[in-house]
């Protein structure tokens, strides 16, 4: 088999056993790798109704067919599980050397189940698997953990959790090399298993069916990746978005009370670059090198737009030193910066309204940087008011009451990213219907709004088709896996991607086949959520966005009405060929071949696998 390895490794931390299992080529072709394969496996390994923080919730790491090839930006891996924040699917991506080592193990997926009695780390060196004591790593930051584990196992690449993951903060991340599988609380799931880290070292190369032809196409993509379509990412990086969005009236400010920030210039990408720039960096196997590291009194720190908005304008913070320090704290604790900023901003407003007196001990007020820093410490350690905030804005607002859910800015429990959707109507729909919750990465629906392809101030039912198409497109990118910053380097994405996949695998793949794969993958996500008690009211936006008009900026006076959103959601369901309430009919699952993907086991419990069956091989006793 080319491109894929045709097997997964299943490790059960409770029994201390591990074994391989074959993966059918039909499933791999139908779901690809990455998030597609991970979603398919989640249906199979997660018992219906499983508690996300229980031992039975699987933590699934997946590779993809393009990982380890000459195609730029493909050193990526996916993490898929049931989210402790939303109760629905959590799928997250991260990058760099850990991704390459996962593929070099000769597996397409690593499935971790069970719970260790004490904190451990998992060490995998090709076919040798060991569970090692990690009690000496408790309380260590993710960076400290990775450094220590690499020293102990001799240079492997490591992914780990910080203290937030140990404490099961519901938006804890899994970190590797300064990057994060960031959203949905995957780090809390890892912490609940008492798994502090995973160290990988492999030696297998990715088999490519037509290496010369692939290398020729890879060279074209590399040249395009250094051209004008990626110029923004290669010059200032994603922090450039803050100033742009402020001018467009889409920059979330003071917990979405405004969409412009009067002090945006103080933390703009241009000012950060002029006063704090340290160096440019990038993931392994990437020519774009979009990362920017900035210096502050607290040290050197990576910073992306989503972190800048969440810890900056969303909380009314205009001090770049404070934003950089806050970002560094989130990295060390292992916290999703979007959910951290969103939850803190909710707490600031709630305290302003006199409903959260314990927040005053942290100094939580809009514009007060010391309060943000204190809150991050409290959340990461689950101490004081941080114990409540560690639950995320949805659960915190339910506990506090007093109508505070009206300004808890989440969808399905996942805090909103850095786009005010009242003046981005396609984006509004994309956020509402996303299986992941409030997410900009699983559709990129904002592109239609920003490009002028549609009227961003007015929504209509036709946006449903736009969002559905963008979700399927993103699903293919996330399952091959290719960085979204490379997307515009493809002239005809589906045709070009099919050609790349054919050269890697030897299949005769078409663009139409990849389109169907994207729809299949997205539908699998939806089906998992339905299995986990999704209801139509979950595809909705926070009350504030449907009640308040934008008060400032070029979008002043623009509103998003419930009727407008309802019309777009219904149009989306029609575009998807789902029923009028958003449930997937059997005819659609049959047309996509979903029920056949895992021998009829999609949506059924298959835990634990018999690791000693003829299809599996028990490894070195653990």
Describe these PLM feature segments.
Residues 603-605, 612-618:
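Charged/polar low-complexity intrinsically disordered segments
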Residues 1-234, 240-258, 396:
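Protein-protein interaction/assembly regions in multi-subunit complexes
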Residues 94-98, 342, 603:
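Solvent-exposed, well-ordered amphipathic alpha-helical segments
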Residues 150-184, 190-602, 611:
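Extended C-terminal regions of large enzymes
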């Amino acid at each position: 088999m080319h491109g894929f390895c045709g097997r997964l490794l299943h490790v059960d931390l409770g029994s201390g056993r591990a074994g391989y299992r074959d993966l059918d080529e039909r499933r791999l072709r139908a779901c690809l790798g990455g998030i597609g394969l991970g979603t398919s496996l989640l249906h199979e390994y997660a018992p219906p109704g499983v508690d996300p923080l229980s031992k039975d919730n699987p933590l699934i790491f997946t590779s993809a067919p393009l990982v380890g090839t000459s195609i730029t930006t493909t050193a990526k891996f996916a993490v898929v599980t049931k989210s402790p924040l939303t109760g629905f699917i959590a799928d997250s991506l991260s990058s760099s050397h850990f991704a390459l080592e996962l593929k070099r193990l000769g597996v397409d997926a690593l499935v971790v189940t069970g719970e260790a009695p004490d904190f451990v780390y998992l060490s995998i060196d090709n076919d040798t698997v060991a569970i090692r004591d990690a009690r000496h790593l408790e309380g260590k930051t993710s960076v400290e953990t990775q450094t220590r584990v690499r020293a102990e196992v001799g240079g492997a690449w490591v992914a780990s959790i910080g203290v937030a993951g140990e404490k099961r903060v519901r938006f804890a991340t899994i970190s590797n090399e300064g990057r994060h599988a960031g959203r949905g609380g995957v780090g809390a799931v890892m912490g609940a298993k008492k798994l502090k880290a995973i160290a990988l070292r492999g030696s297998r190369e990715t088999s490519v069916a037509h290496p010369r032809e692939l290398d020729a196409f890879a060279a074209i993509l590399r040249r395009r990746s250094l051209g004008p379509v990626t110029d923004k990412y290669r010059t200032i990086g994603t922090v450039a978005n803050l100033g742009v969005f402020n001018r467009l009236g889409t920059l979330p400010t003071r917990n979405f009370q405004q969409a412009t920030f009067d002090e945006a210039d103080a933390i703009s990408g241009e000012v950060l670059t002029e006063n704090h720039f340290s160096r440019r960096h990038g993931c392994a196997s990437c020519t774009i090198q979009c990362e920017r590291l900035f210096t502050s009194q607290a040290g050197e720190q990576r910073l992306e737009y989503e972190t800048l908005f969440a810890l900056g304008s969303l909380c009314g913070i205009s001090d770049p030193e404070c934003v950089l320090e806050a970002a560094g704290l989130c990295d060390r604790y292992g916290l999703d910066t979007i959910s951290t900023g969103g939850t803190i901003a909710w707490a600031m407003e709630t305290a302003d309204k006199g409903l959260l007196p314990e927040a005053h001990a942290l100094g939580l007020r809009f514009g007060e940087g010391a309060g943000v820093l204190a809150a991050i410490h409290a959340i990461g350690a689950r101490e004081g008011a941080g114990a409540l905030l560690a639950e995320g804005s949805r659960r915190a607002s339910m506990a506090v009451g007093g109508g505070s859910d009206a300004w808890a800015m989440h969808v399905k429990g996942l805090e909103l990213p850095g786009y005010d959707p009242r003046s981005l109507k396609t984006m509004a729909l994309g956020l509402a219907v996303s299986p992941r919750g409030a997410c900009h990465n699983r559709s990129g629906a904002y592109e239609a709004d920003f490009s002028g392809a549609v009227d961003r101030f007015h929504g209509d039912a036709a946006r449903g088709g736009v969002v559905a198409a963008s979700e399927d497109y993103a699903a293919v990118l996330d399952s091959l896996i290719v960085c979204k910053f490379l997307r515009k380097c493809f002239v005809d994405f589906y045709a070009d991607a099919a050609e790349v996949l054919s050269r890697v695998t030897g299949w005769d793949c078409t663009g139409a086949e990849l389109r169907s794969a994207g729809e299949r993958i997205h539908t699998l996500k939806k089906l998992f959520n339905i299995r986990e008690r999704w209801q139509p009211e979950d595809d909705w936006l926070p009350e504030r966005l449907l009640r308040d008009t934008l008060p400032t900026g070029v979008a002043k006076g623009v509103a998003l009405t419930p009727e407008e959103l309802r019309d777009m959601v219904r149009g989306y369901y029609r575009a998807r060929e789902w029923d009028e309430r958003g449930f997937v009919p059997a005819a659609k699952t049959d047309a996509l071949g979903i029920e056949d993907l895992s021998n009829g086991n999609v949506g059924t419990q298959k835990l634990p696998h018999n690791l000693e069956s003829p299809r599996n091989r028990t490894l070195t006793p653990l």
